[in-house]
Amino acid sequence: MAANQRKIVHVLWISCLLLLPSAKGHIAAVKKNRFQVTNTTRNGKFLFNQLVGLTSFLTGGNDSSEDDDDEGKTRNCTCECGQSNQENRIVGGRPTGINRYPWVARIVYDGHFHCGASLLTEDYVLTAAHCVRRLKRSKIRVILGDHDQSTTEDTPAKMRAVSAVIRHRNFDQESYNHDIALLKLRKPVEFTKNIRPICLPTSGKDPAGKTGTVVGWGRTTEGGMLPNVVQEVQVPILTLSQCRAMKYRASRITSYMLCAGRGAMDSCQGDSGGPLLVPNGDKFEIVGIVSWGVGCGRPGYPGVYTRVSKYINWLKYNLEDTCVCS
């Protein structure tokens, strides 16, 4: 470059109106913003995210049609997912071994336990959309590597603030359809023995007929107290037709949901957002997210979960800026 030449940086001032939706989907407010943009941003999607900042929180990230056709490209990294810390064993609503499932996280809101979550990458956790509805992002904290909420002596837990809330745009607060969300951690976590990511399931693969494991800090009985120690329970996963034949109204159970549970073996209040896991060889995959149900362990009312395999493309699209372990 000649000495008298200067590097040209294109500067564009953008003045835009940001429409803020209310809880019922109507426009609640209009905010005017002016942004300065240079040509140093790497692509249009990144540029737009940098401009708006909370656009993911407001719009739920990428919307998608049937089976999430808008496929993204995630970066595969030299790391492993789904590695538990102890051998599998059959349990029923009993405490787990310390950090047996190192991807299990808990969401704390305004200093209090709120929901469960699962670590997907070094800077994203997966949870239920209803868990983050109407929450102020600044008050959300994600705790990883924890086992017993009442003490800090058993495990070196890590706490992270949240920089973005990505809720599925089609989430229906009445039916709980598309009950899925991502939280981006403000600071990535380092993978250790006690903090590791979970594997995503194979798209289109039905886990029906398998035994799943629900992990979380939810109540062990309906109306009971929240436990300090993370719990696990094994539940049979039903087919869609089996679930629709139960006591739920058949139309309430969509293809984006799956059911699991039998008798007293069920997820309960407080488990929301946590994982339903199945083994795949020597690894675990998250096939469901605790979503909704009637009571806890009531006959004829199995727990209902978000079917994660339906959202692989949605997840890939929204995880383009991070590494997904395999």
Predicted regions and their residues:
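Chymotrypsin/trypsin-fold serine protease catalytic domain
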Residues: 72-78, 83, 150-152, 158-160, ...
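Conserved H-D interstitial segment of serine endopeptidase catalytic domains
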Residues: 83-87, 107-108, 125-128, 133-173, ...
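Extracellular regions of mammalian proteins, primarily the fibronectin type-III
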Residues: 101-103, 115-126, 138, 161-163, ...
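Acidic glycine-/aspartate-rich tracts in secreted/extracellular proteins
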Residues: 130-133, 146-150, 186-191, 218-221, ...
